[in-house]
UniProtKB/Swiss-Prot annotation:
Membrane topology annotation: Single-pass membrane protein
Subcellular location: Cell membrane
InterPro entries (UniProt xref): ATP_synth_B-like_membr_sf, ATP_synth_b/b'su_bac/chlpt, ATP_synth_F0_bsu_bac, ATP_synthase_B_chain
Gene that this polypeptide is encoded by: atpF
Recorded GO CC terms: plasma membrane; proton-transporting ATP synthase complex
Assigned protein family: Belongs to the ATPase B chain family.
Protein's name in the database: ATP synthase subunit b
Organism: Clostridium botulinum (strain Langeland / NCTC 10281 / Type F)
Assembly with partners or alone: F-type ATPases have 2 components, F(1) - the catalytic core - and F(0) - the membrane proton channel. F(1) has five subunits: alpha(3), beta(3), gamma(1), delta(1), epsilon(1). F(0) has three main subunits: a(1), b(2) and c(10-14). The alpha and beta chains form an alternating ring which encloses part of the gamma chain. F(1) is attached to F(0) by a central stalk formed by the gamma and epsilon chains, while a peripheral stalk is formed by the delta and b chains.
Function per UniProt: F(1)F(0) ATP synthase produces ATP from ADP in the presence of a proton or sodium gradient. F-type ATPases consist of two structural domains, F(1) containing the extramembraneous catalytic core and F(0) containing the membrane proton channel, linked together by a central stalk and a peripheral stalk. During catalysis, ATP synthesis in the catalytic domain of F(1) is coupled via a rotary mechanism of the central stalk subunits to proton translocation.
Amino acid sequence: MNISIPQIIAAILNFIILLLIVKHFWFDKITAVVDSRQSEIINKIEDTDKNQKLALELKEKNELELSNAKNQGKTIVEEYKSKAENVYEDIVKEAHEEADRIIKKSRLEAERQKKNAEEEIRAEAVELAVLVSSKTLEKTIDDLEHRRLIKDFISKVGI
């Protein structure tokens, strides 16, 4: 294959003519398409950067809100726990007070029953004393018999 100088010059001239024709008819259109595409890419990159910044801001905001919600949740739980403990303490206190009232009432009732029993015993003792006196008056007794009756009376009364 032989390449001659006129062929090289003809090829260069053809290339230059082709370049001029392409430049004249299509270069502006191609440049416009490339520029349009370039501006679209730049806009998309800028939009992506803006969206990324916005997403980071929203993420930080959401994390802050989540943290606040957790803190509020802890506060609410602690508040209700405190209220529950107070209610528990009130219930226990009321139960102790009720138990103390019942114990006091039971003691008073026992004391009243004891007094009633003592009064009944005294009444019986008086009746026995009257009975002994009447028996004593019915018969004349000597000193030994009198002592035996008193001991008998005391043993019956339980004094």
